[in-house]
Structure formats: structure tokens, C-alpha cells
């Protein structure tokens, strides 16, 4: 199974169940995606827990204090192992007319679409978040 799709599905399921915290197995790519989600304000906090085997990431999800709606409305995988999606800096996709974020894997690491566009580098579009 695709580990990134599994990571996104665990977050999606935790949001649907209104969980405050979700724990996912750690990997370097998941850590970088988590950092981008935190920097863009989609999650409240995160903590990397190292263990003997793999470690885990505890993610505190962000909800609106009054309406209890999640900051993440939709999170979807774009580039899949069977069909990779690559883009140039000029053709970087706009998510929800700029209101959402595309997370991109570039030669300089994993970053948001806006950061990649500013650095004028393209890469593999991992997922959309809005």
C-alpha cells in the first residue's frame, strides 16, 4: 500500500470521527508533510516520538472553537504510485483558486506550492489540502 495515502487516510478518518489527536507511523516524507501542514495552519501541533523500530507522529488536529469544524475540509492524494503527477513551476496547480495548498516534493525537499513557485522549481504533486 502507498504509505502517503495511508497517512492522509488516517488524518481524514480522524477528522470525520472528530478526534483531537491522531497517531501515524513515522517516515521522513510524512514528517516533512506534517511540517508543511503545521506551517500552513491546518494542524494545531505535532510531535515526533522515536521508538526502537519506526517511531510515530502524534498530530493534534485543529478545529474551530465555536462551530467545531476542522481546519482541513479535504485532503486528497494526487500523485499515486501507479500514476505520478509532475509539474513545472510555471504550471503549478492552484488549489481552490489559491485558498488551498498543494504539497510538492521537489529537489529542495517537500514544500508548499507557493514556496516552490517562489524558488522557481517544480516537482511531484503529492496532495491537495483545503
UniProtKB/Swiss-Prot annotation:
Which keywords has UniProt assigned to this entry?
A: Ribonucleoprotein, Ribosomal protein, RNA-binding, rRNA-binding
User: What cellular component terms from Gene Ontology apply here?
Assistant: ribonucleoprotein complex; ribosome
- Coiled-coil annotation: which residues? none
Pfam families per UniProt: Ribosomal_S8
- For the keyword rRNA-binding, the answer is yes
Q: Which GO terms describe its molecular function?
A: rRNA binding; structural constituent of ribosome
- BP GO terms, sorted: translation
SUPFAM superfamilies according to UniProt: Ribosomal protein S8
Function in brief: One of the primary rRNA binding proteins, it binds directly to 16S rRNA central domain where it helps coordinate assembly of the platform of the 30S subunit.
Similarity comment: family membership: Belongs to the universal ribosomal protein uS8 family.
Describe its partners and assembly state: Part of the 30S ribosomal subunit. Contacts proteins S5 and S12.
Name recorded for this polypeptide = Small ribosomal subunit protein uS8
Q: Which organism is it from?
A: Cytophaga hutchinsonii (strain ATCC 33406 / DSM 1761 / CIP 103989 / NBRC 15051 / NCIMB 9469 / D465)
Lineage, top ranks: Bacteria, Pseudomonadati, Bacteroidota, Cytophagia, Cytophagales
Amino acid at each position: 500500500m502507498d504509505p502517503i495515502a495511508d497517512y492522509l487516510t488516517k488524518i481524514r478518518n480522524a477528522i470525520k470521527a472528530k478526534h483531537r489527536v491522531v497517531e501515524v507511523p513515522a517516515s521522513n516524507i510524512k514528517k516533512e508533510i506534517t511540517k508543511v501542514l503545521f506551517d500552513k495552519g491546518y494542524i494545531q501541533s505535532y510531535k515526533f516520538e522515536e521508538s526502537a523500530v519506526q517511531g510515530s507522529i502524534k498530530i493534534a488536529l485543529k478545529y474551530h472553537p465555536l462551530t467545531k469544524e476542522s481546519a482541513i475540509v479535504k485532503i486528497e492524494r494526487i500523485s499515486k504510485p501507479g500514476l505520478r503527477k509532475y509539474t513545472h513551476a510555471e504550471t503549478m496547480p492552484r488549489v481552490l483558486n489559491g485558498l488551498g495548498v498543494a504539497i510538492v516534493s521537489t529537489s529542495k525537499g517537500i514544500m508548499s506550492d507557493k514556496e516552490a513557485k517562489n524558488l522557481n522549481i517544480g516537482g511531484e504533486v503529492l496532495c491537495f489540502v483545503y
